[in-house]
């Protein structure tokens, strides 16, 4: 790991306020469709804090599932080798599925997860991400709910790591490399 420090990009208060808004929007969306079998799938490890907070803001009965994906390794750039290292425990056939992601960068991870889950015949599949870096997108994936659009910075905090560090920060910070 290179010598660095972390500057605040999005404050803890702003993160929590936006999650409350997203939860209300998601609740309204599914209530209007009279959906009562929502499965929320968190993509680990980065989404664990966001997942815990967003499901508490969704005012509907939900089932919780997790998948673990990997595409970063221990560096600061993503690669196209997306691996599923932990799959869902339950069946999603005929159920409405909401994928919860920490950050969308190139789009490859979400494309692979979405394709895998669609093969399992859910009734619907939607996506909510805390952070979106549209300037880095290489694969377009439809995303229904975005917390924050951010510039092309390497970010940490609120579950997101740099070489397994900084996940515990309550805010979103940008990594600044030091000379």
From Swiss-Prot:
CDD domains: PRTases_typeI. The keyword Nucleotide-binding applies. It is found in: Cytoplasm. The keyword Ribonucleoprotein does not apply. Diphosphate binds at residues 45-46, 167. Its cofactor is Mg(2+). IMP binds at residues 101, 105-110, 133. Pathway: Purine metabolism; IMP biosynthesis via salvage pathway; IMP from hypoxanthine: step 1/1. GMP binds at residues 101, 105-110, 133, 161. The active site is at 105 (proton acceptor). PROSITE patterns: PUR_PYR_PR_TRANSFER (PS00103). GO terms for molecular function: guanine phosphoribosyltransferase activity; hypoxanthine phosphoribosyltransferase activity; magnesium ion binding; nucleotide binding. InterPro entries: HGPRT (IPR050408), Hxn_phspho_trans (IPR005904), PRibTrfase_dom (IPR000836), PRTase-like (IPR029057). It catalyses: IMP + diphosphate = hypoxanthine + 5-phospho-alpha-D-ribose 1-diphosphate; GMP + diphosphate = guanine + 5-phospho-alpha-D-ribose 1-diphosphate. One of its GO terms (biological process) is purine ribonucleoside salvage. Its EC number is 2.4.2.8. Mg(2+) binds at residues 101-102. One of its GO terms (cellular component) is cytosol. Keywords: Cytoplasm, Glycosyltransferase, Magnesium, Metal-binding, Nucleotide-binding, Purine salvage, Transferase. Homotetramer. Purine salvage pathway enzyme which catalyzes the transfer of the ribosyl-5-phosphate group from 5-phospho-alpha-D-ribose 1-diphosphate (PRPP) to the N9 position of hypoxanthine to yield IMP (inosine 5'-monophosphate). To a lesser extent, can also act on guanine leading to GMP, but shows a highly less efficient activity with xanthine. Belongs to the purine/pyrimidine phosphoribosyltransferase family. This is Hypoxanthine phosphoribosyltransferase. The lineage of its organism: Bacteria, Pseudomonadati, Pseudomonadota, Gammaproteobacteria, Pasteurellales. The gene is hpt.
């Amino acid at each position: 790991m290179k010598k660095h420090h972390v500057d605040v990009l999005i404050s803890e208060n702003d993160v929590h306020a936006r999650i409350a808004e997203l939860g209300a929007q998601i609740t309204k969306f599914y209530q209007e469709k009279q959906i009562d079998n929502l499965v929320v799938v968190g993509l680990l490890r980065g989404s664990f804090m966001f997942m815990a907070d967003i499901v508490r803001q969704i005012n509907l009965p939900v089932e919780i599932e997790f998948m673990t994906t990997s595409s970063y390794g221990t560096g600061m750039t993503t690669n196209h080798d997306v691996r599923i290292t932990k799959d869902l425990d339950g069946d999603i056939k005929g159920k409405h599925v909401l994928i919860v992601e920490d950050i969308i960068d190139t789009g490859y991870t979400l494309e692979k997860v979405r394709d895998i889950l669609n093969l399992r015949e859910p009734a619907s599949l939607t996506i909510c991400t805390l952070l979106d870096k549209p300037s880095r997108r290489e694969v377009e994936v439809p995303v229904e709910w975005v917390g924050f659009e951010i510039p092309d910075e390497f970010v940490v905090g609120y579950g997101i790591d740099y070489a397994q560090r900084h996940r515990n920060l309550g805010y979103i910070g940008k990594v600044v490399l030091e000379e």
